[in-house]
Amino acid sequence: MEDRREALISKLMNMLVENGFSVSGTGFQPVATFDIVARRDVERYILKVLYNIDTLKQSTAYQLIKLAKLLRATAAIIGERTGNGQLEDGVVYYRHGVPISSVNTFESYLNGERPYIYSGPGGFYVRINGELLRERRNELNLSIGNISSYLGVSRRSVSLYENGSAATIDIFIRLRNILKADIVDHIDLFRINSTEINFEEKISDEYIARIIWLLQKYGLDTRPIFKVPFDIVAKDSDEISLIAALIGDAPEPERVRILKKISDVFEDDAFLVSKSNTYRESIGGCAVLTISDLESIEDKDALIGKIEKRAK
């Protein structure tokens, strides 16, 4: 199954490049929170690839949503199967609040064709624009009772549709045929409401806890990140995002390389924080700072200036 997942990652990366995206991967690590980051102008995506989407863990979904919020990106999972069979093209699925689709559906979405069908308990559904439904019904001089008779549903169901409830595919098609109008609520099914998620977490590593405290002192929303090639992500209220990794005396070259590539794709600053004092100012194109450096920096602008200077 891992071979199939790796093939799916390669297919997705090729598709993104063909559609004008800059991309970076994490090296096919099956336990990683994400597999690909991609950017095209202002579009930023953090993607996890699963052959079977039912294998998604809640902890992975949580980290993916948190990371996307901090990096001002859209999180999504690209898959191929559920426990019941192949993913249907043109349909968005959800697991633990994260949108999921096939490669073909995601490519269509990137090219402006927003899917409007989503998978829910018992089948596929379409969100109805209740206001348009009501307006069109009145234009045709149809009562709620008329519509309910045509559809074979209760008046209450029609009232719910007019209040924005979703309809099954069968009901939606019949309703569209009756009204001869586009009554789809064209919301972005890939949009995640992360405001309902509590991102507070216990931090067991004293170094990471210290770094987070120091970055928060500069007015940066700073969080730990797990199962990724870095440890901390911070952002301000404007357009600045920072990615940081804690390193020891012998940093892993592959980890640094991936960190640098991710920061290049997103055009965000990445830096390494050394646990001990070091003479090195950069490794692999990433600035190196110590805890002492962070303690002596006065504000956010000075921090960014030091990172950019040492990264050169």
Swiss-Prot record:
Gene3D superfamilies: lambda repressor-like DNA-binding domains
HTH cro/C1-type domain mapped to chain residues: 133-186
Known DNA-binding region: 144-163
Record InterPro entries: Arc_TR_HTH (IPR020886), Cro/C1-type_HTH (IPR001387), Lambda_DNA-bd_dom_sf (IPR010982)
Entry keywords, A to Z: DNA-binding, Transcription, Transcription regulation
Record bears the keyword tRNA processing: no
Single GO MF descriptor: DNA binding
Entry annotated with the keyword Signal: no
Annotated protein name in UniProt: Putative HTH-type transcriptional regulatory protein TV0294
UniProt source species: Thermoplasma volcanium (strain ATCC 51530 / DSM 4299 / JCM 9571 / NBRC 15438 / GSS1)
